[in-house]
């Protein structure tokens, strides 16, 4: 590999890693415009293994918007990222990539004692619902940079703790 190819590969991997981080932040912040902007127009998302839906990125963003209202405090931790960039003939990076990444998602279910938006949540923000599993992301290079073509959630476990008074 030449230095130019190695540099391009590193830059692609960083951009793809940033795309995955952007996914977590958009969901945690409830920023559905940013969520939609992560995808190509025909992007697809599958949350069925976690009891959700499968559909277009727009349809899933609408579903997540409704579902995440139950969890005023949430934080996706996406780790163990394995990024694979397809190669062209000659070893140059191609225009498609896949990422397998584990996630841990502690959340706090909404309740009568939750702080109002913008206020300090204090002790009521302790996570009482946690789920974990693996994301499989597919991405392709677009005019505006790397964008997601597909996200599949493979939930492995979940835990619901009793609410504390």
What spans do the regions from the language model cover?
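Short structured motifs
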Residues: 20, 76-80, 122
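A solvent-exposed, acidic/Ser-Thr-rich amphipathic alpha-helical stretch
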Residues: 32-109
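Short aromatic-glycine motifs in intrinsically disordered, low-complexity regions
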Residues: 67-70, 123-128, 140
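Binding-site signature for planar aromatic cofactors or substrates
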Residues: 11-20, 94, 102, 107, ...
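Short, surface-exposed loop/helix-turn segments at secondary-structure junctions
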Residues: 111-124, 129
């Amino acid at each position: 590999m030449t230095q130019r190819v190695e540099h391009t590969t590193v830059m692609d991997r960083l951009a793809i890693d940033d795309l995955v981080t952007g996914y977590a932040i958009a969901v945690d912040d409830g920023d559905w415009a940013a969520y939609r902007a992560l995808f190509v127009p025909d992007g697809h998302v599958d949350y069925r293994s976690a009891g959700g839906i499968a559909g277009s990125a727009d349809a899933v963003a609408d579903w997540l918007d409704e579902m995440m209202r139950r969890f005023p405090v949430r934080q996706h931790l996406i780790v163990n990222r394995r990024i694979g960039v397809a190669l062209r003939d000659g070893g140059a990076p191609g225009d498609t990539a896949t990422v397998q990444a584990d996630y841990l998602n502690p959340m706090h279910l909404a309740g009568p004692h939750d702080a109002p938006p913008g206020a300090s949540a204090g002790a009521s923000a302790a996570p009482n619902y946690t789920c974990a599993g693996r994301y499989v992301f597919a991405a392709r290079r677009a005019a505006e940079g790397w964008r997601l073509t597909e996200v599949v959630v493979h939930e492995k476990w979940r835990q619901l703790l009793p609410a504390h008074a």
